[in-house]
């Protein structure tokens, strides 16, 4: 509904979207019985699965969501082209970290998608003290269902240095 409303400038209460699924045994194209394709995984699902794998430090699982042209840009314009480089850089900063999502927003341009995640970080510093409620925003660019770019903004440097 939101995409249709933004395209035609209509109030959501005045727009009706209908989708009719075709039973697989009724699906034909080019005079041949075919199996319809399943819907692709949505960009926000890809991003959340990637971040869950990263939180678990399962780099192998996280890597399946990445394009060969992947790049991550961290605060201070630190740039990495592999998860191994990125995690090596991040390792001395904290013992563990997790994200609480307050919102996830998606926009599309053709087959490309941009996903913004925003929320708070919590975890444990290397000295064993807990941290929480540190703001973050991550921006992801996806092409053909793969992450090509992750940009990270957060308040961790301020939280690490104290009030």
Predicted feature descriptions by range:
Residues 60-111:
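A solvent-exposed, acidic/Ser-Thr-rich amphipathic alpha-helical stretch
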Residues 4, 17, 50, 61-63, ...:
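Hydrophobic pocket/interface hotspot
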Residues 111-121:
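A short hydrophobic beta-strand element
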Residues 1-39:
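A domain-level signal for the structural core that forms small-molecule/cofactor-binding pockets
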Residues 35-68, 163:
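Short, low-complexity N-terminal intrinsically disordered segments enriched in polar/charged residues
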Residues 18-20, 73, 153:
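Solvent-exposed beta-strand sheet faces enriched in polar/charged residues
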Residues 135-163:
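Short beta-strand edge/turn micro-motifs at domain boundaries
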